Amino acid sequence: MELPQEYIDKMVNLLGEEEFSLYLASLEEERSFGVRVNTLKISNEDFLENLGEIINVKKVIPWTNDGYYYAPFEKENTELPGKLPFYHAGLYYIQEPSAMYPAQQLDVKPGDKVLDLCAAPGGKSTKLGVKLSGEGLLVANDISQERVKALIYNLELAGVRNVVVTNESPERLAKKFNGYFDKILVDAPCSGEGMFRKDNEAVKSWGKFKTEVCAGMQREILEYAHVMLKPGGHILYSTCTFDPSEDEYMIKEFMEKFPEYELLPLEKRGGITDGLYGMSEAARLWPHKLKGEGHFTAMLEKKTQAKEENSKKSDCEKKSNNNKSYKVLKDAPDEFKTYWKKNMQGDIPSGYYYVAGDGLYFLPCVPPDIDGLKVPKIGLNMGELNHCKFKPSQQFAMAYGDMFARKITFAYDSEDVKRYLRGETITVSSDFGDGWHAVSVGVKGKTEKGYVLGTGVINGGMLKNMYPKGWRRLI
């Protein structure tokens, strides 16, 4: 790997000649691959028992409770995890191992209001959604209109029920969400030095996205995060770069400007080391000290309400707001209740139902006022209300698929599961009754344990495929 001389000089100065040689050698080694289990849909135990051999899982990633290394090229004829139907059931997320650390460390609890400020493509947001367990609220934001599409897809695939996705600048969000959030994750844009082994384009673009450019963005993002955080709340700051100006010095500068913050210690396992320059509470993940590409992480607690702007009630919580983006209903609409009673098991979801156009949406907590913001996803889209009937969405299937009264399961290596994911109509046994069914994928020989891919309507032995066009895949 050919590195820019300016970068080499900087890293030698940071690490010293001997440790830099170890770092440089690690860049020539084979990178590690990671997969994180989505425990909203499958337990770690079931994942290992049913999918461990298929994916070729090797061992647990030590700084996670749901991440595993896998070896995609060790065996012949091994399918890549992203090519398997189980991926399309949202059972796991493919993620670089060290990138799993920040969201694991942010102490999110069910019921919290959480902001992922730089969220795309969604690896950390989906983990935060798992931690919330369907309670509280996750706001996942990304400023890029293009990248936010991947963010929405990954959150919907994971079955996260309590998320609003915004496509805004931190400045505009801060005007709405003043003092609103309990926890904020800032996975800041950075010079990407921890991506060099994984992505050669990161090496080529290093000169373009230099530290001084990135530091300016990071400084601004952190200051807006401060405005949006409640007293007593936590900011988890992370980068995938090694430059102290974007890491320890950025945190030091922020704390000097906002002295009401203090650093909290992070758990360090599997080769994770302390931050540099005496910042022992922070964490460094180096590629020559562990199996991962590299990260910096620090957690800050807001101790007092030092500035007047944080004492104001958040705009999105004010009772006087006349929200024009949606209409909150007093109860679930009759069309939805009728569908649930006929096709689902268990109690109807308890929370807030609201409509925007023909769409029925749901959140477990009071929906925030998002008037004036770009919001491509305003909660869980349950489906459409049209002509006095309810038609479920793909999001509904991914979030509540296990509650369908009727399910049809195809083996993961069958032609039928491939046909389903391509959006084709499928002939099924006459043993299946007519009506709505969850369509699921099962492990060969264990098709009674199916994982939901979507829905279909059976009529006279034919399964009408309801898998959405935008999701269809050739596998």
Show where each model-derived region lies.
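Class I S-adenosyl-L-methionine
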Residues: F181, H234-Y237, F242-Y361
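Mobile active-site "lid"/loop adjacent to the S-adenosyl-L-methionine
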Residues: E146, D182-E223, C240-E248, R269-G270
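Conserved class I S-adenosyl-L-methionine
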Residues: G111-A120
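Helix-to-beta-strand junctions that scaffold the AdoMet/dcAdoMet cofactor pocket
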Residues: S133, L229-P231
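Conserved SAM-binding loop of SAM-dependent methyltransferases across substrates and taxa
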Residues: P121-G134
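Polybasic, low-complexity RNA-engagement segments
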Residues: M1-L14, E18-L48, G52-I54, K303-I475
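A short acidic, Gly/Pro-enriched loop at the edge of an enzyme's catalytic core
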Residues: K109-P110, A174-L185
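S-adenosyl-L-methionine
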Residues: N141-G179
